[in-house]
Amino acid sequence: MFQLLRRAHGLCMPSSLYFSRLVNRSLLSKSPTLAKIVHAQLLEAGFVRTTYWGNRCLQLYFKSGSVINALQLFDDIPDKNTITWNVCLKGLFKNGYLNNALDLFDEMPERDVVSWNTMISGLVSCGFHEYGIRVFFDMQRWEIRPTEFTFSILASLVTCVRHGEQIHGNAICSGVSRYNLVVWNSVMDMYRRLGVFDYALSVFLTMEDRDVVSWNCLILSCSDSGNKEVALDQFWLMREMEIQPDEYTVSMVVSICSDLRELSKGKQALALCIKMGFLSNSIVLGAGIDMFSKCNRLDDSVKLFRELEKWDSVLCNSMIGSYSWHCCGEDALRLFILAMTQSVRPDKFTFSSVLSSMNAVMLDHGADVHSLVIKLGFDLDTAVATSLMEMYFKTGSVDLAMGVFAKTDGKDLIFWNTVIMGLARNSRAVESLAIFNQLLMNQSLKPDRVTLMGILVACCYAGFVNEGIQIFSSMEKAHGVNPGNEHYACIIELLCRVGMINEAKDIADKIPFEPSSHIWEPILCASLDLGDTRLAETVAKTMLESEPKSSFPYLVLIKIYEMTWRWENSVKLRYAMNEHKLKSAQGSSKISIESSVFSFEADQLQIHGGHDTCALLDLLSWDSFDQKIHWSA
């Protein structure tokens, strides 16, 4: 092979330039065989014993994964310099030889800043973040001055504010320029990840120069800290300062508009995407689909998706998630199947969305998706397992859900919350309490407000008054969670179910914040059941004051007024309902026939074959009537 190369170049003995080009091309190929051939040629030319060519050949072996050959060559290099040791250290880390790398670092006769940076980045790449930080502190004890690369690595792995402050202080003491975008962007993003918004903002304000990455980090910091309106303000300020946004910027802004249900501003951001040519980016398009969906414009989401020339997993996930958000399980499943026919491979987000969209009449389809989950190896993923359990609980298949629970390792808090709530809603209160007790024994997880809501629901459905009151009373003291509207509503419903209506009203009257109408609903229903129209009227009026656009208190008051012959008040309320365009909630049912799901609402004929069905019922009624006449005769 190399004889041909020599002839092509007209060379009898290759030059240093020839070998330099050859090594560079061989590094791109990553071929172990080619690495050996190049090494042999260097030996033949007498170059390999020089430190420079030994180092280059060492790089070649490590790049091709030939670690044994690399270590043999390392031992053969007579005059090793710091670069030789650094190349070997980096190569060992890159190929996963962690213990060898640690031993080599200890043996190094001299370490420069590159050696320390390689050690830190190597430990980080192997997942040993804490050790990486310790090495940084050791580096300081050896009085090695860190570089901007050191700080950017460290900022990406810090997990506590104290360490973050130390690294920030070291960057200042090391004289890092305020114009250094790499370091200060990394420090700002570090504070964002740690949830210290004020610190991230202070870094941004002290920077002498800012680029689009700086602004992106600021916008994301505002959004993550819950200041989404402020995040949008920063985006428009960025535009005023003529900083050109990138695709990541606009995707963030569209997502923020989605969370705020700001349709008009979201449309402006999408218009900017069109102007800047960002609509070819899947993440931007996915954010747009999600934004329209959450702003109750599902038709626009579908329209945007249908205009796509090519599908990928990000876009399909967004559309399936939109269908799931609007409880369109059939459409989500149909798109899921169609995406696979278009060679779009589902991922964990796809499965989570499509499983979450399935309703109580889609058990057979859910079982099919579960089989595919197992086949593709996603059954071990906690998020997918959570969605599987949620689907089975919704369809009433508690045993199948608990089978998923038993087989899943690495359960997170969302997983535990799902099983507690699922058991509660399927009238398995005793099992729900048992799972809750298992969670309490887990040292790494602590119940949150969702967990406690689930266990209160279990007590409510089962009528466990003592257990419910005990859990509710200990929320703040034992678990550090202040009861919210949903917790008060649940404990009040529990008391009302067992006839303790006065105790329930006492709790409602002592709520330390403005209660929602959901808190008063159980008391209202219980007072109606007991025939206490005076209390029912008082509660209904209270609900009407807090939520004037809810139809339920209107209907209750109308019923009370008609029962007590107060027709004038009843007419006034009916007029007010019409004026506010309020309607009573419609009951609905669903039925699955083969591969289709049909939805039926009360007083609605706009269903599949609705008028034909009613005509057939009329004929059957007449036929039945004729039969009765015939038999009576």
UniProtKB/Swiss-Prot annotation:
An example Gene Ontology molecular-function term: RNA binding
Type E motif: annotated segments: 519-594
Secretion signal, residue range per the UniProt entry: none
Main location per the UniProt record: mitochondrion
Transit peptide, residue positions per record: 1-30
Protein name as it appears in the record: Pentatricopeptide repeat-containing protein At1g43980, mitochondrial
The keyword GTP-binding appears for this protein: no
Gene designation per UniProt: PCMP-E58
PPR repeat copies, ranges: 50-80, 81-111, 112-146, 147-178, 180-210, 211-245, 246-280, 281-311, 312-346, 347-380, 381-411, 412-447, 448-483, 484-514
Entry similarity comment: Belongs to the PPR family. PCMP-E subfamily.
